[in-house]
């Protein structure tokens, strides 16, 4: 066969070689019949039962995904529960049933109308149509007593090819068996793309209808960086792809071309993330999210359970720095043992350090005790701790005083402990504006660009209609980063970054130029960012940063960065 290439959007900087396995889940969905004489009351009851069963499935799936992939990725299933219970949708299904449709057909018809509405909006809103499809297909399957297709045990070396992959589909994929996936539709910010990065899977989306010409069993090369799908590749192409898949991972510290050390660390959402982070060459952990210890359970973890988790992270990196973020939970997450307020906008409400110094003070003290003990667990244990959502000097001082008072308590009890390196997340405009006042009181700042962009631009992260505003390439966001780094200069205070921006190799030179000392990201991009650091000259990087900071618009920023590539 002659080698040919199809092009799409590469979403992971990884390559894979394997055999096509087509996944066509829509084939078994029933076509809606003309309205018939049905027992509307019985069908409505079936629909309600199916909703309850689907919600139970989603909660279980959320828990599995949080454990296997990460808490942030698992949050997509919270959105699915919202769709499942959305009054507009449920009322539409009820109306369709009362007009004479059986429940499964009413679900299919109503959800499909909403899917089309989302697709017509385009952009990121269009990508969210896959979430609606996922909920629709789940309900239809439950109503039809259908079996769920199992993607978790595919033959080794499979390349999954599909019209689209929903979050439920992608969460099943096993990186040990699957060599990658390719879809007809989709974009860089789709949930399938996000899961691919978290699972370290080569992936291409948005190839278009030409992908339908690739048959089951065909050998392919998936280049997740360029977006090229090579069909019937030559032996030379396969060997080159296999070599590319065997990434030259640096397992030692990296420095710029002119000798400046930059730490490249991994973000950790569960203990299962530690192994891949080590394997991909992370120097340490730049963000250890502790929420997974507290979620999906009926009571909080005790001191010893937390201690063991923190020690496991420290031992995984054997002297590499592990930065733990204290509990950051608010009204957006269901925690049965906490009295969380029902807030209109929980992201601007009682969360993070606000709860730790208030209603969750006892929980915070237990966490602090575990952290102080972990810091003294072994010679060379390199633990740092940071507080989330700090906005005032009073919060910072109170948080630090809590660590010092708990350390005194442990000393009095004769329990080995050590005060770790202490810092704060910079994710609110207040923290960026007040960074010069915070710097004398901390050992480090960690800039959370996802939330910083959201709060600086007043553009909710989950609201697709304003997603372009909440981009970290916005000049206001870049200037907030620059202000934070500038405030740390002259103080014994290093500056890291743990948002999505840190893991973009195309932005590494800019971030070095802005003065970042540490970059933390999903483990999958660690090798590429290390390679980008090694190619960066700090003088050139500072020049790039100065030019970017003069830009008035996001488009100007993008143009400067493109010209510099």
UniProtKB/Swiss-Prot annotation:
Family: Belongs to the PEP-utilizing enzyme family.
Name under which the protein is recorded: Phosphoenolpyruvate-protein phosphotransferase
Catalytic activity: L-histidyl-[protein] + phosphoenolpyruvate = N(pros)-phospho-L-histidyl-[protein] + pyruvate
Organism, as annotated: Haloferax volcanii (strain ATCC 29605 / DSM 3757 / JCM 8879 / NBRC 14742 / NCIMB 2012 / VKM B-1768 / DS2)
Induction info: Expression is highly up-regulated in presence of fructose.
Family matches, as PANTHER family: PHOSPHOENOLPYRUVATE-PROTEIN PHOSPHOTRANSFERASE
InterPro entries linked: PEP-util_enz_mobile_dom (IPR008279), PEP-utilizing_PTS_enzyme (IPR050499), PEP_util_C (IPR000121), PEP_util_CS (IPR023151), Phosphohistidine_dom_sf (IPR036637), PTS_EI (IPR024692), PTS_EI-like (IPR006318), PTS_EIN (IPR008731)
Remaining remarks: The reaction takes place in three steps, mediated by a phosphocarrier histidine residue located on the surface of the central domain. The two first partial reactions are catalyzed at an active site located on the N-terminal domain, and the third partial reaction is catalyzed at an active site located on the C-terminal domain. For catalytic turnover, the central domain swivels from the concave surface of the N-terminal domain to that of the C-terminal domain.
Keywords on record: Cytoplasm, Kinase, Magnesium, Metal-binding, Phosphotransferase system, Sugar transport, Transferase, Transport
Coiled coil start-end: none
Sequence positions that bind phosphoenolpyruvate: 289, 325, 450-451, 461
